[in-house]
Design a protein with these regions (language model features):
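N-proximal low-complexity "stem/linker" segments adjacent to membrane-targeting elements
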Residues: 1-59
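Acidic helix N-cap motif at the loop->helix transition within catalytic regions
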Residues: 48-51, 80-88
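Well-ordered alpha-helical segments embedded in enzymatic catalytic cores
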Residues: 52-56, 111-115, 142
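A conserved acidic beta->alpha catalytic loop
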Residues: 66, 75-83
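Active-site-proximal specificity loops/subdomain of glycosyltransferases
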Residues: 88-118
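Acceptor/aglycone-binding surface of glycosyltransferases and processive sugar-polymer synthases
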Residues: 101-109, 135-188
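Short aromatic/hydrophobic "clamp" motif used to bind/position activated sugar donors
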Residues: 125
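The conserved acidic donor/metal-binding loop of glycosyltransferases
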Residues: 129-135
Length: 188
Protein backbone atom coordinates (compact mmCIF):
# COMPACT_ATOMS: atom_id res chain seq x y z
CA UNK A 1 0.00 0.00 0.00
CA UNK A 2 1.47 3.33 -1.00
CA UNK A 3 1.64 6.26 1.37
CA UNK A 4 -1.18 7.94 -0.58
CA UNK A 5 -3.36 4.83 -0.24
CA UNK A 6 -2.62 4.74 3.47
CA UNK A 7 -3.72 8.34 3.99
CA UNK A 8 -6.83 7.73 1.89
CA UNK A 9 -7.64 4.66 4.00
CA UNK A 10 -7.22 6.66 7.22
CA UNK A 11 -9.34 9.49 5.82
CA UNK A 12 -12.17 7.16 4.82
CA UNK A 13 -12.10 5.38 8.16
CA UNK A 14 -11.73 8.29 10.52
CA UNK A 15 -14.86 9.76 12.03
CA UNK A 16 -15.54 12.74 14.23
CA UNK A 17 -18.31 12.78 16.82
CA UNK A 18 -19.83 15.88 15.19
CA UNK A 19 -20.81 13.74 12.18
CA UNK A 20 -23.45 12.11 14.40
CA UNK A 21 -25.08 15.25 15.78
CA UNK A 22 -27.91 15.83 16.40
CA UNK A 23 -28.44 12.45 18.04
CA UNK A 24 -32.00 11.91 16.80
CA UNK A 25 -30.82 10.47 13.47
CA UNK A 26 -28.33 8.20 15.21
CA UNK A 27 -31.02 6.97 17.61
CA UNK A 28 -33.32 6.25 14.66
CA UNK A 29 -30.55 4.26 12.95
CA UNK A 30 -30.04 2.27 16.14
CA UNK A 31 -33.78 1.61 16.49
CA UNK A 32 -34.03 0.45 12.86
CA UNK A 33 -31.23 -1.99 13.51
CA UNK A 34 -32.95 -3.33 16.66
CA UNK A 35 -29.50 -3.39 18.26
CA UNK A 36 -29.12 -2.97 22.01
CA UNK A 37 -26.15 -1.11 23.48
CA UNK A 38 -24.26 -1.50 26.74
CA UNK A 39 -21.74 1.07 27.91
CA UNK A 40 -19.19 -0.62 30.15
CA UNK A 41 -16.57 0.90 32.42
CA UNK A 42 -13.96 -1.48 33.83
CA UNK A 43 -12.87 0.21 37.06
CA UNK A 44 -10.59 -0.08 40.05
CA UNK A 45 -10.37 2.69 42.63
CA UNK A 46 -11.92 5.37 40.42
CA UNK A 47 -14.09 7.08 43.06
CA UNK A 48 -12.82 10.49 41.93
CA UNK A 49 -14.31 10.13 38.44
CA UNK A 50 -16.83 7.28 38.24
CA UNK A 51 -19.81 9.23 39.61
CA UNK A 52 -19.54 12.06 37.10
CA UNK A 53 -19.03 9.65 34.20
CA UNK A 54 -22.06 7.52 35.06
CA UNK A 55 -24.24 10.56 35.79
CA UNK A 56 -23.40 12.35 32.52
CA UNK A 57 -23.84 9.24 30.37
CA UNK A 58 -27.02 8.12 32.15
CA UNK A 59 -28.73 11.49 31.79
CA UNK A 60 -27.71 12.11 28.20
CA UNK A 61 -27.54 8.71 26.54
CA UNK A 62 -29.85 6.52 28.60
CA UNK A 63 -32.60 8.92 29.67
CA UNK A 64 -32.67 11.76 27.11
CA UNK A 65 -31.52 10.37 23.79
CA UNK A 66 -32.14 6.68 24.57
CA UNK A 67 -29.07 5.78 22.55
CA UNK A 68 -27.87 3.19 25.09
CA UNK A 69 -29.76 0.57 27.08
CA UNK A 70 -27.54 0.07 30.12
CA UNK A 71 -24.47 1.40 31.86
CA UNK A 72 -22.39 -1.29 33.52
CA UNK A 73 -19.36 -0.99 35.79
CA UNK A 74 -17.16 -4.06 36.22
CA UNK A 75 -15.20 -3.40 39.39
CA UNK A 76 -11.79 -4.92 39.98
CA UNK A 77 -11.75 -4.83 43.78
CA UNK A 78 -11.99 -1.13 44.56
CA UNK A 79 -11.41 -0.02 48.14
CA UNK A 80 -12.25 3.67 47.69
CA UNK A 81 -16.03 3.69 47.29
CA UNK A 82 -16.13 3.26 43.51
CA UNK A 83 -18.85 0.59 43.73
CA UNK A 84 -21.18 2.60 45.97
CA UNK A 85 -20.74 5.77 43.92
CA UNK A 86 -21.40 3.98 40.61
CA UNK A 87 -24.51 2.31 42.03
CA UNK A 88 -25.81 5.57 43.49
CA UNK A 89 -25.53 7.19 40.04
CA UNK A 90 -27.51 4.40 38.40
CA UNK A 91 -24.94 2.00 36.99
CA UNK A 92 -25.35 -1.74 37.20
CA UNK A 93 -22.22 -2.89 39.06
CA UNK A 94 -20.59 -6.32 38.92
CA UNK A 95 -17.50 -7.30 40.88
CA UNK A 96 -14.90 -9.18 38.84
CA UNK A 97 -14.58 -11.90 41.46
CA UNK A 98 -18.31 -12.69 41.21
CA UNK A 99 -18.22 -13.16 37.43
CA UNK A 100 -17.06 -16.60 36.30
CA UNK A 101 -15.39 -17.40 39.63
CA UNK A 102 -14.68 -20.94 38.40
CA UNK A 103 -12.16 -19.43 35.96
CA UNK A 104 -10.09 -18.05 38.83
CA UNK A 105 -8.81 -14.53 39.25
CA UNK A 106 -7.15 -12.57 36.50
CA UNK A 107 -5.39 -9.28 36.79
CA UNK A 108 -5.67 -5.80 35.42
CA UNK A 109 -8.06 -4.09 33.09
CA UNK A 110 -8.16 -7.07 30.74
CA UNK A 111 -10.03 -9.12 33.31
CA UNK A 112 -12.71 -6.45 33.57
CA UNK A 113 -13.03 -6.25 29.80
CA UNK A 114 -13.28 -10.02 29.40
CA UNK A 115 -15.72 -10.52 32.25
CA UNK A 116 -17.91 -7.69 30.98
CA UNK A 117 -18.73 -9.89 27.99
CA UNK A 118 -20.54 -12.19 30.41
CA UNK A 119 -22.59 -9.55 32.25
CA UNK A 120 -23.46 -6.90 29.66
CA UNK A 121 -26.75 -7.50 27.86
CA UNK A 122 -26.22 -5.32 24.79
CA UNK A 123 -25.63 -6.60 21.30
CA UNK A 124 -22.88 -3.96 21.21
CA UNK A 125 -20.58 -3.09 24.08
CA UNK A 126 -18.97 0.33 24.14
CA UNK A 127 -16.07 0.33 26.59
CA UNK A 128 -14.80 3.59 27.98
CA UNK A 129 -12.23 4.38 30.63
CA UNK A 130 -13.37 5.01 34.19
CA UNK A 131 -10.77 7.70 34.85
CA UNK A 132 -11.89 10.27 32.27
CA UNK A 133 -11.92 13.70 33.87
CA UNK A 134 -13.57 15.59 31.02
CA UNK A 135 -16.35 13.15 30.17
CA UNK A 136 -18.83 14.11 27.48
CA UNK A 137 -21.49 11.94 25.79
CA UNK A 138 -19.63 12.39 22.49
CA UNK A 139 -17.03 9.93 23.79
CA UNK A 140 -19.72 7.26 23.40
CA UNK A 141 -21.78 8.41 20.43
CA UNK A 142 -18.61 9.09 18.47
CA UNK A 143 -17.85 5.36 18.80
CA UNK A 144 -21.39 4.16 18.12
CA UNK A 145 -21.99 6.43 15.13
CA UNK A 146 -19.92 4.54 12.55
CA UNK A 147 -21.41 1.21 13.64
CA UNK A 148 -24.97 2.40 13.09
CA UNK A 149 -24.42 4.43 9.94
CA UNK A 150 -22.09 2.19 7.90
CA UNK A 151 -23.03 -1.51 7.67
CA UNK A 152 -19.50 -2.35 6.53
CA UNK A 153 -18.03 -1.33 9.88
CA UNK A 154 -17.99 -3.94 12.63
CA UNK A 155 -15.32 -2.59 14.98
CA UNK A 156 -14.52 0.93 16.15
CA UNK A 157 -11.51 2.07 18.19
CA UNK A 158 -11.29 5.60 19.51
CA UNK A 159 -8.23 7.77 19.62
CA UNK A 160 -7.91 11.07 21.35
CA UNK A 161 -5.58 14.00 21.35
CA UNK A 162 -5.36 14.44 25.08
CA UNK A 163 -2.88 15.44 27.73
CA UNK A 164 -0.61 12.74 29.05
CA UNK A 165 1.51 12.68 32.19
CA UNK A 166 5.14 11.70 31.66
CA UNK A 167 7.39 11.62 34.66
CA UNK A 168 6.34 14.72 36.61
CA UNK A 169 5.21 16.81 33.65
CA UNK A 170 1.92 17.08 31.80
CA UNK A 171 2.31 17.21 28.02
CA UNK A 172 -0.54 18.88 26.14
CA UNK A 173 -0.79 16.02 23.64
CA UNK A 174 0.43 12.49 23.55
CA UNK A 175 -2.56 10.31 24.33
CA UNK A 176 -3.79 7.86 21.73
CA UNK A 177 -0.34 6.63 20.73
CA UNK A 178 -1.14 2.91 20.96
CA UNK A 179 -4.14 3.32 18.69
CA UNK A 180 -2.27 5.36 16.09
CA UNK A 181 0.94 3.32 16.11
CA UNK A 182 -0.47 -0.18 16.53
CA UNK A 183 -4.23 -0.68 16.42
CA UNK A 184 -5.15 1.21 13.26
CA UNK A 185 -2.34 -0.19 11.10
CA UNK A 186 -2.91 -3.76 12.35
CA UNK A 187 -6.67 -3.57 11.80
CA UNK A 188 -6.08 -2.33 8.28
Amino acid sequence: MSQLDTWEWFGNRTFHYSQFEPLAALREARERSATTVSVCLPARNEAATIGQIVRVLRRSLLERSRLVDEIVVVDGGSSDGTVAIAQSEGAVVHCEGDVLPEEGPGSGKGEGLWKSLHVCHGDLICWIDADIRNIHPRFVYGLLGPLFTDPGIVYVKAFYERPIRERNALRATGGGRVTELLARPVLN
